[in-house]
From Swiss-Prot:
Name assigned to this protein: Tereporin-Ts1
Biological source species: Terebra subulata (Chocolate spotted auger)
Tissue: Expressed by the venom duct.
Family: Belongs to the actinoporin family. Conoidea subfamily.
One record GO biological process: killing of cells of another organism
Signal sequence, start to end: 1-11
One GO CC annotation: nematocyst
């Protein structure tokens, strides 16, 4: 399971580390403000995941900004499947979607999902990798934003390859932070002068 929070008006000079406990506290407080959107109105996040598959991934995003997140775009590995499609996320709402491994193949599921911030001309991008074999691979997740004015989604797995393989996340049109979720599940946090994105991922196959 992946949880991501998109917040507005964060300050890059706030250098105090945000711990998993602090994030949990913030999520608890936000539960009084953030409400379920259409996709989660009648189910919990884990209820979106496909049953009968070794590797699935259910993703929830909470929009703490005043900007609607629109034009959701998913790009995943070949033969994997989107079992519940992502939707637009209004301010003050949380929405979820799910993906699964390819049918009949010993492969995991990986890719990116992104939304445009209405009126800002930027895209919020979330990358995940949920492997089939934990002997050689781990769960990974990354979160970031495109530079102002960049809303076009590149073809194929361009953003996934950048967020999974690049050693630095502060060059080019997409800036991001990423983390490995194996021994620990501490949150990944991306900040710039306007926004802050926090995300965490479980370290199991049904992520």
């Amino acid at each position: 399971v992946i949880f991501a929070l998109v917040l507005g008006n964060a300050s890059p000079v706030q250098s105090v580390a945000i711990t998993a406990t602090a994030v949990a506290t913030a999520i608890g407080a936000a539960s009084q403000i953030i409400s379920a959107g259409t996709s989660l109105a009648s189910t919990i996040l884990s209820g979106l995941a496909a049953s009968g598959y070794r590797v699935t991934c259910a993703i929830q995003v909470e929009n703490w900004t005043r900007y609607p997140l629109i034009y959701a775009t998913v790009q995943i590995n070949r033969n994997a499947a989107v079992t519940v499609s992502p939707s637009s996320i209004l301010p003050g709402k949380r929405e979820g979607f799910s993906v699964r491994m390819p049918n009949g193949l010993a492969e995991g599921v990986y890719g990116t999902v992104s939304w445009e911030l209405l009126g800002i001309k930027r895209r919020f991008v979330l990358m995940w990798s949920a492997p089939f074999n934990f002997n050689h691979f781990s769960n990974w997740m990354g979160v970031g934003l495109t530079r102002p004015g960049i809303t076009k989604v590149p073809s194929g797995m361009t953003w996934f390859n950048k967020m999974y393989y690049d050693k630095t996340g502060r060059v080019g049109n997409l800036h991001f932070e990423r983390g490995e979720f194996y021994y620990e599940t501490n949150p990944v946090i991306y900040r710039d002068s306007k926004f802050e994105i926090e995300g965490t991922m479980t370290n199991i196959h049904n992520a």
